[in-house]
Swiss-Prot record:
It comes from Mycoplasmopsis synoviae (strain 53). Its EC number is 3.1.26.3. Its cofactor is Mg(2+). The lineage of its organism: Bacteria, Bacillati, Mycoplasmatota, Mycoplasmoidales, Metamycoplasmataceae. The active site is at 56, 128. Digests double-stranded RNA. Involved in the processing of primary rRNA transcript to yield the immediate precursors to the large and small rRNAs (23S and 16S). Processes some mRNAs, and tRNAs when they are encoded in the rRNA operon. Processes pre-crRNA and tracrRNA of type II CRISPR loci if present in the organism. Its main location: cytoplasm. InterPro entries: dsRBD_dom, RNase_III, RNase_III_dom, RNase_III_sf. Mg(2+) binds at residues 52, 125, 128. Residues 12-139 form the RNase III domain. Residues 165-231 form the DRBM domain. This is Ribonuclease 3.
C-alpha cells in the first residue's frame, strides 16, 4: 500500500497478473478501480463510473451470449431466469469477493475508505468497470474469456439449484459481510386480518412485506430487501 493506504500501481499490476488479466494501457485499469471519493480530492484522476456504465451493458450482453452457447438445452424462459441470476448485484458481488477487488480500489480518506470497501454495490460496480476495461484494452474475446472463467461456477450452481427461500437467500447475503443475523419485526394488522413485517440488519430496515400469515409477511419482507439489494 502507498503511504495513505491506497493501493499502488505495482499492487494493481500484481492483481491483474494473478487473475490472468493482460493489459496494454494500465490507466484504464487504474480508472476502473478508482472510487469517486478519491477522484474528488485528486483532480487529475478519473473514477470508475463511466466504465461501470459500459460494463453494465457488456455484462448483460456477454452473459446472454454465454448462456445461449453453454446451455443449449434450455428454453428461452429458462435462459432468461438463468441470466437474471447472473447479472444481478449478488452474483457480481460473489465475483468481487473471489477476486478480492477491495484490495485494489482507490478511495477517499480513512472513514470514506471503510464505508466504500464495505459496500457490496461498490465492489460489484468495480467488477463491471474491470470488464469494460478488459474490453476496451484487449477486445471482446478477452472480455468473453473473463466472463466464462468467473461466471461458469455460478452459472452451473444457479442452473442446478432450485430457487431459495427469500429469507435464506437474504441471510446468506449478509453472512458474507457480517456475523449479525437478519431480524424480523412483525405485527398483526387486526382490521385487515394480515401481518406486516420489516427485515432488519445492523439497525437498518432493508425491506418490508405484508402477508396473510406471519411467515408470508417475513418472506415478502426478505424478497423486498433482496430486490433492493440487487438493483
Amino acid at each position: 500500500m502507498e503511504k495513505d493506504n491506497q493501493p499502488s500501481i505495482e499492487e494493481l499490476k500484481a492483481f491483474l497478473q494473478k487473475n490472468n488479466i493482460e493489459y496494454k494501457n494500465i490507466d484504464l485499469f487504474i480508472e476502473a478501480t478508482t472510487h469517486k471519493t478519491y477522484s474528488k480530492v485528486n483532480k487529475n484522476s478519473k473514477d470508475y463510473e463511466r466504465l461501470e456504465f459500459l460494463g453494465d451493458s457488456l455484462v448483460g450482453f456477454l452473459i446472454s451470449d454465454y448462456c445461449v452457447r453453454e446451455f443449449s438445452s434450455l428454453e428461452p424462459g429458462e435462459l432468461s431466469r438463468l441470466r437474471s441470476k447472473l447479472v444481478d448485484k449478488l452474483a457480481l458481488f460473489k465475483i468481487a469477493q473471489k477476486l478480492k477487488v477491495e484490495q485494489i480500489i482507490k478511495t477517499g480518506p480513512k472513514k470514506a475508505r471503510n464505508e466504500v470497501l464495505s459496500s457490496s454495490n461498490v465492489l460489484s460496480d468495480v467488477v463491471e468497470a474491470l470488464i469494460a476495461a478488459i474490453y476496451l484494452d484487449q477486445g471482446m474475446q478477452s472480455a468473453k474469456d473473463f466472463i466464462k472463467s468467473h461466471f461458469y461456477e455460478i452459472a452451473n450452481k444457479a442452473q442446478n439449484k432450485p430457487n431459495k427461500d427469500p429469507k435464506s437467500e437474504l441471510q446468506e447475503y449478509f453472512q458474507t459481510i457480517s456475523a449479525e443475523t437478519v431480524k424480523y419485526e412483525t405485527i398483526e394488522i387486526p382490521n385487515k386480518r394480515s401481518f406486516e413485517s420489516k427485515a432488519w440488519h445492523l439497525n437498518k430496515i432493508y425491506g418490508t412485506g405484508v402477508g396473510l400469515s406471519k411467515k408470508d409477511a417475513e418472506k415478502n419482507a426478505a424478497a423486498n430487501a433482496l430486490s433492493k439489494l440487487k438493483t
